[in-house]
Amino acid sequence: ADKPYEYYAGYIALGLFRDEDDVKFSPDQSGIAGRKVLPGDIKYKDVNGDGVINSDDQVPLSYKANYPRLMYGFGGEVRWKKLTLGFLFKGTGNVDNFCVDGYKAFGFLPFSSGETGNTLAITANQANRWTPREISGDASTENPNAMFPRLSYGNDHNSTQPSTFWKANVRYLRLQEINLNYNLSAGKILKQLGVSSLDLQFVASNICVWSPFKHFD
């Protein structure tokens, strides 16, 4: 009764396991991982405090919808002498995306979604994922707050669990259109053609987008 109608449930992520001691002294989550968890894996919160991470620790994460619950737009125009500049903005708010396909919704699996949007460039950057210092030569890459967990081979059940780790705010504000108009008063040639006035107009669409979500559009 205290949960929203039609919601996505999942785990609360606590970042990534820092080292072997962090794994050893944390609640056991090998059941959902299907293997022993390792440093660099996503670490989940033991919500009910029983020392084991399982479905009983899942909580509501988001409304079960991939469309924004807030949509808005605004525009206007500025006039100066014979010039008129018009503009139109459109935006959304209160909308989440889970960047993993555990929900069978739009999103991507880390390291396996090819060239979807900016995914390849982001995951290829070693600074964005947990990497052992033995590989990188730099201890700072063992970052428990990295954007992506450690690189793994095959189906990684631990990293693809629905959780707050993959939850992203995908609100945006888009400059949808700019319209520039210049009015030509009727000169001698225009009058001879029977034209009282002439407007020259330039229109640009979908100019730019501001959003905290950078992986793909």
What is the role of each PLM region?
Residues 70-76, 175-180:
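Hydrophobic, lipid-facing positions within transmembrane beta-strands of outer-membrane proteins
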Residues 87, 200-202:
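Membrane-embedded beta-strand positions of outer-membrane beta-barrel proteins
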Residues 3-7, 92-194, 198-199:
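Extracytoplasmic gating/loop element in the C-terminal half of outer-membrane beta-barrel translocons
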Residues 53-62, 158-165, 217:
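Extracytoplasmic loops and strand-loop junctions of Gram-negative outer membrane beta-barrel proteins
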Residues 1-66, 113-143:
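Conserved small-residue
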Residues 59-67, 99, 168-171, 217:
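Outer-membrane beta-barrel proteins
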Residues 80-83, 195-197:
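Strand-connecting loop/turn motifs
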Residues 82-87, 187-188:
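Repeated loop/turn-to-beta-strand initiation elements of outer-membrane beta-barrel proteins
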